[in-house]
Amino acid sequence: MSTLTDDDLVLEPIADGRDPSWTVTVTGEKAGTIDLRDEEHGTASVRWDVGAGDQATWTGARALRLVIDHAFDELGYTRVEARVPVDRMDDIRAGSIGGMRREGIMRGAGNEPDRALLGRLHDDPPATSREGFIALLNAGLPTKRVIAQGRLLDEQGRVLLCRLTYKKEWDLPGGVVEVGEAPAVGLVRELREELGVTVDVGDLLTVNWLPAWRGWDDACVFLFDLGRVDASYVDSMTLQPTEILGVEWCDAGAVREHGAAAAVELLAAVDAGDLPSYREAPRAPE
């Protein structure tokens, strides 16, 4: 098995065969170990132990680059992955600097820790290229859940709320925006899928940040004006039975009685007027 080198960093082989491993040395001093494990179907997993701290992070990243290149170029793997406990941030950083993208979190059962899943494919752009660098940064950035909802009124000024299959409170029509989808486009799609109607999206009324609540992560709600229609408009709707039990025109009293806490608070702010373009909703009672 080959000795792998990068200037003063040397990987000396310990074990050959199906699961090779190396001793990591820097300027002749042992820094730790790194090994590959065959996971079948063209995939290998990599593990390393070079300590903690900034210097260890850089050492781990350099060792990873050598081993990953060896896995692709010499051993014929098409994917190398690592499963790193989420509290080992130095190792997660080393994986990213070493060219591995953050792909998600693997939950740990019982006393096992949750683990960050890192991965690199043989045809990913080089980590030192512009495309590769952006891809690595993008994979590690947090994402924000986005919800698009619409305020649709009838000729009496009542607002449309949906009775839902998955919670007792009624809510505004709309839903979660898909990755890469514009909020207004997502609202049109959601109403077409769930209510069977195609709407014209008007002005943005506000962006409403919702804090985490009842096991749901925080989210940003884009509330759009859907205008006014005749109350009979609901007769043309075809409801998606897995999510929508029914729809109701609601005055302020009905909203307070049946609406989800976030919807009640938001609609009250809309009715009060002078709504800011961005607002933060108060934390609802659990």
Question: Model segments located where?
Answer:
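Conserved catalytic-core motifs of GNAT/GCN5-like acyltransferases
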Residues: 83, 99-117
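Unchanged
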Residues: 177-200, 208-261
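Conserved GNAT acetyl-CoA-binding A-motif
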Residues: 73-85
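Conserved beta-strand in the GNAT
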Residues: 29-37, 45, 149, 160-161
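Acidic, metal-coordinating catalytic segment for phosphate/diphosphate chemistry
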Residues: 119-149
